[in-house]
Amino acid sequence: MAALHITDIEAAINYWRARKPSPDGVTLAPEIRALAEVYALMVFFHEDEADARGFPPKAWDAWLQWYDSTPDTPCIAICSTSQGDEVCKGCGRTFEEVQLWPGMDPVDKRATWRRITLDGTSWRFNRYAERAAEGQAGPEPAAAA
């Protein structure tokens, strides 16, 4: 079962809060409202993950737009799987994940990202952290209208 972790939903909410801040401190942008409904249910039912099947369409669209703003791959161009390692020392993905990455769906990619981030032992998190794409400055959010 492919599932979205609550931390990704939080990150998507914060992404939209930066891009579409509340004009009055109360009103939420449609993307935030859609994601917040899912988040609230997860908190209420003490769930860490939401099944991707049946995810509300507006929340899914908002989540996908956030996902598109994240680095696609954890690769830092030091792939030890090409030398026979089962797990890449550079990014922390398994040989199979490296091979199948282009065809994986966003939810499965985010699950892999979560696993390697929690593990935190690959070189992208220490020795070669400067190579990590998420450490680079991205475009500024649009100003509120």
Where are these regions (language model features)?
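N-terminal acidic leader/helix
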Residues: 2-26, 73-80
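Amphipathic alpha-helical interface segments used for dimerization/assembly
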Residues: 9-13, 17, 35-36, 40-44, ...
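Short, charged low-complexity linear segments at domain edges
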Residues: 64-83, 141-144
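Short cysteine/histidine-rich metal-coordination sites, predominantly Zn2+-binding motifs
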Residues: 93, 103-113
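Short Cys/His-rich "knuckle" micro-motifs
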Residues: 98-102
